[in-house]
Amino acid sequence: MTIAATEALTRCIEHREIFHDEMLHLMRLLMRGELSPQIASALLMGLRVKKETVGEITAAAQVMREFATPVVTPNPQDLLDMCGTGGDGSHTFNISTTAMFVAAAAGVPIAKHGNRSASSSSGSADVLEALGANLQLTPEEVAECVAATGIGFMFAPAHHGAMKNVAAVRKELGVRTIFNILGPLTNPAGAANQLMGVFHPDLVGIQVRVLERLGSRHVLVVHGKDGMDEASLGAATMVGELKDGVVREYEIHPEDYGLSMMSNRGIKVSNREESRALVIEALDNVDGVARDIVALNAGLAIYAGNKADSIPEALALAFETISNGSARAKLEEFCAYTRKFQK
């Protein structure tokens, strides 16, 4: 065991924060596979039991970004990511993935970071493939997609190869660790703007402050009070916002924007084909909960992407983009463009 690991474990046992430089060092050891499985497991569980701090998560995210395979674009400060933690257990269709087509059609350049299903019925990569997208793209091809269509999708395993060094430990543990909240913090394109859904209310304030330290521009971190890692129509939504260097926390309610409170029962799915059907239904402007929850989340994305000065203005733009067909057209454009790169 390294001296740094011994000190870190002692700090976890005593519920004290691991110093920033120590956390950087330990994460580099983890990402290089230089800690034994026993020490890696002890460290991950120690952090979880102690509860990871903003400083520790920030350091861990910085190291994951160091090890990531980047996507280079001319203006990362304009890009928006829409990547949630997942793990909310709601089994709803892919709301944020659908909303990205609406936001992109409204002029927000999207660099979405996503993966296959871990705990849900359909991950973002799963449903995009069901919709006809090719996700086996090089970083250069992703950047070309962003330039040509306004959307790039970065399949997480292709950009975070070092994660293979902790995969066995995570699988053996079988419980959430710090890595479950690092994914949305490690966008390979360096997107400065973000709409992030989180599975636990405590993460709203934590993640927005981590992104503040990481230098983000405009961020909304959301948690539906019915447990969703999205803005919800079934309950109020907690929001942590970073804008102009200032963090605010507040709640939004569907009724504030003229939306009806609706149950999420009608948007639960059990596989990617059911999710695909609801994506199409929402983008085809079929009246109902699928369309409205997509519009709500797309509105927040448009606001976070700085294409509207307020949430009400952004929500109106989201509904307009759905109703005039441009969001559905954006889906078709993106999928067709990615297929150009099929080997």
From Swiss-Prot:
Per UniProt, the keywords (alphabetical) are: Amino-acid biosynthesis, Aromatic amino acid biosynthesis, Glycosyltransferase, Magnesium, Metal-binding, Transferase, Tryptophan biosynthesis
GO annotations of cellular component type:
cytosol
Annotated pathway, please? Answer: Amino-acid biosynthesis; L-tryptophan biosynthesis; L-tryptophan from chorismate: step 2/5
An individual GO BP term: L-tryptophan biosynthetic process
Binding-site list for Mg(2+) 2: 229-230
Q: Which reaction does it catalyse?
A: N-(5-phospho-beta-D-ribosyl)anthranilate + diphosphate = 5-phospho-alpha-D-ribose 1-diphosphate + anthranilate
E.C. designation(s): 2.4.2.18
Binding residues for anthranilate 2: 170
Molecular function terms in GO for this entry?
anthranilate phosphoribosyltransferase activity; magnesium ion binding
- What is the similarity comment for this entry? Belongs to the anthranilate phosphoribosyltransferase family.
HAMAP family reported in the protein's UniProt record = TrpD
State whether it acts alone or in a complex, and with which partners, per the record. Answer: Homodimer.
**Can you say what this protein is called?**
Anthranilate phosphoribosyltransferase
Query: Origin organism of this chain?
Result: Bordetella pertussis (strain Tohama I / ATCC BAA-589 / NCTC 13251)
Q: What is the lineage of its organism?
A: Bacteria, Pseudomonadati, Pseudomonadota, Betaproteobacteria, Burkholderiales
